[in-house]
Amino acid sequence: MKVGIISFAHMHALAYAKYLTEHPEAELTAIWDADSTRGNKMAEQFGSEYYSDLDELLQTDVEAVIICSENVNHKAHVFKAASYKKQILCEKPIATEIEDAKEMIQVCEDHGVILQVAYPVRFVPAIQKVKDLVQAGKIGEVIAVNATNHGQMPGGWFVEKELSGGGSATDHIVHIMDVLRWMLKDEVKNVYAEFDTRFYDIKVEDAGLVTLELESGVIVSIDPSWSRPKTFPTWGDVTMEIVGTEGTIAVDAYKQHSLLYNDADGKIQQMPWAEDMDAGLVNDFIDCVKTGRQPFITGTDGLRTLEVVKAAYESDGLKETVLLKRN
């Protein structure tokens, strides 16, 4: 199965390209990037062909594409790929605006193509085990969740609101919310959030706290801050403490690792030994395309998490709790 990558603007594209080239039933044959220098470099690195014209790439025999462009460009690239009837894996967030996300879902339905959104945390074995335990009632009725998705400040277009749609809240709320919706089979009722810029001299938020009430009454807190220093062993963390009436489960998605101490690199590094979540995401997408089944993570999942992000920004602006408007 031949696959193309549309843009390496997002750093996750590197992992997706790696796992495409390692997959026994897939090959990365085509790359487009608005940055020709970056595009040519990636094509050489992964033994692929660089296209300076996106239409030319989409006219090839690739069956599917992975879109890793700047957030604001997701809609245009999904529309174009769908028009050529290519199956689509789109980097998160699905879009920067709710109406754009809805239109992206619709255009993919109209053209009969898959729209999968890149939420790889679902593929972490420890997270999957926690989901099984929660749904089996091992901690009773869930009443609260305390979660973090901290990270290092990525810089570049991520801190340019016109390209990213926002800062750390846009970048990190969505991962936690996707896992919670999937794990608890619940939706958000209301949101209260406060954001600020505390760590860096940038024009988007890099710190904040989000408090949610789910339809079931579960209370959730999320810290989505870019608060990890450059010396942190990995890019960030994904942690959850799930409190139930009969017990508590704590999980760290990146806990399965060894530590590498190397003076030459100037920092401690985490060396993961568990299955990589990005590999799980790519494998699932390839299986969807080959079998024709619906993806594990749909465009609607992307829309639901984006709604929470937008409600959080609204709450921060109003300084009050906001009822979620589901589309």
Model-derived segments and their meaning:
Residues 35, 46-107:
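Beta-loop-alpha module in the N-terminal Rossmann-like domain of NAD(P)-dependent dehydrogenases
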Residues 177-256, 280-293:
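Contiguous beta-strand/loop segments that form the cofactor/metal-binding neighborhood of enzyme cores
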Residues 52, 90, 115-117, 222, ...:
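Hydrophobic residues in well-ordered beta-strands that form the structural core
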Residues 5, 26, 43, 56, ...:
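C-terminal helix-rich "cap/oligomerization" subdomain common to oxidoreductases
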